[in-house]
Amino acid sequence: MKRDYYEILGVARSADKDEIKKAYRKLALKYHPDKNPDNKEAEEKFKEVNEAYEVLSNDDKRRRYDQFGHAGVGSSAASGSGPGGAGYGDINDIFSAFNDMFSGGGGRARTGGSPFSGFEDVFSGGFSGSGSGRRRSAGIQGTDLKIRLKLTLEEIAKGVEKTIKIKKLVTCRECNGTGSKSGKTEICPTCHGSGEVRQATKTMFGQFMNISVCPTCGGEGRVVKDRCPSCYGEGIKQGEATVKITVPAGVQDGNYLTLQGQGNAGPRGGAPGDLIVVIEEKPHELFKRNGDDIIYDLSVGFPDLVMGTKIEVPTLDGHVKLTIPAGTQPNTMLRIGGKGIGHLRGGGSGDLYVRVNVFVPKEVSGKDRDLLKELKKSTVICPNHGDENHEKSIFEKAKDIFS
């Protein structure tokens, strides 16, 4: 079972971004493979720390994790800890920490005199999400797409599989997503395929290297000469797609489900974004939800409350017989076990609570009125609170003594 991301970084759930980054830097330096050669345990911890930081440093992923646990972020965090993933993309935080300690400066600029001046170059090419190798092959990442999925309480109780059509950006079939009419692209003449431009500045403290995204190709490393007339060189166009969504039992209104790679297609061969499905719970005409339990209001006649009875009540999957014990008082909650919402993490379901209320007719006929008058004469059925011979209170007795 995966450990809690907050526990891995050793921070509270209320920690802000600075606290999370500080904890990450400390642990990343501690378990970095260069400091722990041939140490498998340290290597695994380093991956674990990167995975936790990738989620908690991203506002959207952190919100999904807080609401839905590891299921809310799916496998995105784990995939991010490999080469080219977001986890190693934040490895610059480690280099920033090295610069803080040894050169006294912050930021991304590097000096030729720093003992770690070449350290970042090694990793940015092999691991960083901003490395030139990634730009040459990955294109532009597609954007995430968010939709709302309305579900009934019955669907939420058992879990459901939905197949729906959505509108999204899809890969252009005419150019196969390249954006080029001929299907070919050329190496960018400005950055020569690296996706970035570098400018060296010499100062009295050494040489600074400033790196920025290539303005010609936007960081892709390649340019389109003969634009596709169907997608205007973007490699994507508006379209439709059919997606299958598996919703587990026990989700709540506002929960997120993330379908990896089901979002908008990326321009010119870029990886697709994710489809974020926001759960919307429809109001139910019979039941009210309380966590994984549901509540049903049942009106019962006065005679049945007094003498007891058996009544058929609805559930989310049919009807069951409920025994009303003799002498049941109004607003009593009777429990029917296992007839509520399935638990999100599995292992059973919540309960159905029947709230018993007394039924009071708005109008009665002459015969029924006579029956009620007869019942009213019984002090057991209707205690006569207006009887002058009722037992006096202690205050009334004291008043009689001193009057």
Swiss-Prot record:
SUPFAM superfamilies: Chaperone J-domain, DnaJ/Hsp40 cysteine-rich domain, HSP40/DnaJ peptide-binding domain. PROSITE patterns: DNAJ_1, DNAJ_2, ZF_CR. Zn(2+) 2 binds at C188, C191, C214, C217. CXXCXGXG motif repeats lie at residues 172-179, 188-195, 214-221, 228-235. It comes from the Bacteria. It holds the Pfam family DnaJ. A zinc finger (CR-type) spans 159-240. GO terms for biological process: chaperone cofactor-dependent protein refolding; DNA replication; protein refolding; response to heat. Its cofactor is Zn(2+). Zn(2+) 1 binds at C172, C175, C228, C231. One of its GO terms (cellular component) is cytoplasm. Residues 4-69 form the J domain. GO terms for molecular function: ATP binding; heat shock protein binding; unfolded protein binding; zinc ion binding. PANTHER family: CHAPERONE PROTEIN DNAJ (PTHR43096:SF48), DNAJ HOMOLOG 1, MITOCHONDRIAL-RELATED (PTHR43096). Participates actively in the response to hyperosmotic and heat shock by preventing the aggregation of stress-denatured proteins and by disaggregating proteins, also in an autonomous, DnaK-independent fashion. Unfolded proteins bind initially to DnaJ; upon interaction with the DnaJ-bound protein, DnaK hydrolyzes its bound ATP, resulting in the formation of a stable complex. GrpE releases ADP from DnaK; ATP binding to DnaK triggers the release of the substrate protein, thus completing the reaction cycle. The J domain is necessary and sufficient to stimulate DnaK ATPase activity. Zinc center 1 plays an important role in the autonomous, DnaK-independent chaperone activity of DnaJ. Zinc center 2 is essential for interaction with DnaK and for DnaJ activity. Homodimer. Belongs to the DnaJ family. This is Chaperone protein DnaJ. It comes from Chlorobaculum tepidum (strain ATCC 49652 / DSM 12025 / NBRC 103806 / TLS).
